[in-house]
Amino acid sequence: MKILKAHEMSSIDNKTIEEIGIPSLVLMENASKGVFENIRKYFPDAKNILVVAGKGNNGGDGLALARHLYLNGFSVDIFLAFGEVKGDAKTQLEILKKIGIEPLKKKPDFKEYDLIVDAIFGTGFQPPVKGEVANLIKEINNSSVPIVSIDIPSGLSADTGESFEPSVKADLTVTFQFPKICHYLYPAAKKCGKVEVVDISIPEFLAKDVKRDLLRKSDLKPYKREPDTYKTKEGSVLLVGGSVGKTGAVIMSAKAASRAGAGLVTVGIPRELNPIFESLLIEEMSLPLSGTSRLSVFCVEEILELKDRFHALGIGMGMDRYEEGQDIVISLLEKWEKPILIDADGINNLADYGDYTPLKDREIPAVLTPHIGEFSRLTGYDTKTITYNQIDIAQEFSEKNRCYLVLKGARTVISTPDGRAYLFADGTPALAKGGTGDVLAGILTALIAKMDTEEALKLGVYLHGLAGKVAEKKLHTESVKATDVTESLPEAFREIYVN
């Protein structure tokens, strides 16, 4: 499912009307019917409803909705936020008057209603809200009455995750044909409540050039083992990292890689820390490399000498941030000619190095898996700007540096060297625990060892999020640990592969 910006939705609306030939009033009718059905679904006990309408098409949707409500036995009042309407909204108001519904002459007591419908501003609005309408929105929010927003909560921008003030805080948002960025990116998404997407007969192919997609289970291409397979055919991965105080990170990655289907998992760690790993790893093997409390740059040649044993390399988990670490990461970017994933301190060391030419010049694009703080170091953008615009900034970085990116957070963005982006919006706050990123790094390294990279990232991110939800259901949001996510991977696989 495509995720659109305001100008893209406007263009598609116009093409639907002018080129396809579906009249705007038909689209409005379909939209209002969709909102009506969702009100009946989510608010079955609401009988006394107020529609607050703006003067444009969003207001027109609200006025058409008022007609459907009235004709189906609801008690409906309409209040015009600007005291006037235009275009198709004016047509809808004239219809209402002919069936006996007149707009209220003064602002009502919002608390008297069972439900308020926000139809003030649509996707074309640019914040902030000013004047009397700003006060109106504040009063609606303060009423404690459930709110349904049409298309987007009034006061938000469709194109960003920023939560502008004032803006309506909806319990349900019903949008049309395609979701918008504000429906998913935080903190704006918290203003949207539950989001429902209604088909209003706009042809889907009109959005074919949009490079933003919502990642859903139906988009996945699960890997299937051949009946005559063997362990090395299922991917031999090398995970490099670990330092004093952070040995657990790469261990968690290794165990996750095994659970994610890697045929063989080897952990490359500083030689003096090997006894720790030998005591904690059973199914996975350890590879002692040059280094005492952390890896030495001499480990690069040791890794490259063994490159034929491995199909993919993951580096950075618990690695530490230091000058020699920069040399390790850059050298492997330049010399490792197979799939490579860079996580955690591997990313920090790359950011500290500051020159991403080795990233751009790779024949096989690298995979970077930063959280927003690490991505801030890579890009120079502050974390707030990234949070509000993470899809755009991820796409920009991947295209510019010819790499894959998995930008981790409450919403996870996968971006590709050709500028595509996939948004995973079905995770859980239970994953906000140390180590879950290391688990994801292990899952993804296992999958890129034997799958097309783009498909591997989509599958891995979805698996990780689903495993988090499985663990949360078995335990509790507060009690989930990173290792619980790993142990929940079998159930996540079953849900994707069987169901």
Swiss-Prot record:
Cofactor(s) essential for the protein: K(+)
Cysteines paired by S-S bonds: none
Ligand binding (ADP): 408-412, 428-437
Binding-site list for (6S)-NADPHX 1: 151
Region (NADPHX 1): 57-61, 122-128
EC annotation from Swiss-Prot or TrEMBL: 4.2.1.136, 5.1.99.6
SUPFAM superfamilies per the UniProt record, alphabetical: Ribokinase-like, YjeF N-terminal domain-like
Listed InterPro entries: Carbohydrate_kinase_pred_CS (IPR017953), CARKD (IPR000631), Nnr (IPR030677), Ribokinase-like (IPR029056), YjeF_N_dom (IPR004443), YjeF_N_dom_sf (IPR036652)
The name this protein goes by in its record: Bifunctional NAD(P)H-hydrate repair enzyme Nnr
PANTHER family: ATP-DEPENDENT (S)-NAD(P)H-HYDRATE DEHYDRATASE (PTHR12592:SF0), ATP-DEPENDENT (S)-NAD(P)H-HYDRATE DEHYDRATASE FAMILY MEMBER (PTHR12592)
Listed HAMAP family: NADHX_dehydratase, NADHX_epimerase
Pfam families, A to Z: Carb_kinase, YjeF_N
Binding positions ((6S)-NADPHX 2): 318, 438
UniProt entry keywords in alphabetical sequence: ATP-binding, Isomerase, Lyase, Metal-binding, Multifunctional enzyme, NAD, NADP, Nucleotide-binding, Potassium
Known catalytic reactions: (6S)-NADHX + ADP = AMP + phosphate + NADH + H(+); (6S)-NADPHX + ADP = AMP + phosphate + NADPH + H(+); (6R)-NADHX = (6S)-NADHX; (6R)-NADPHX = (6S)-NADPHX
Stated family: In the N-terminal section; belongs to the NnrE/AIBP family.
GO molecular function, a single term: NAD(P)HX epimerase activity
Region (NADPHX 2): 371-377
Domain YjeF C-terminal: 214-496
UniProt-annotated stretches for the region NAD(P)H-hydrate epimerase: 1-208
Sequence ranges assigned to domain YjeF N-terminal in this UniProt record: 9-208
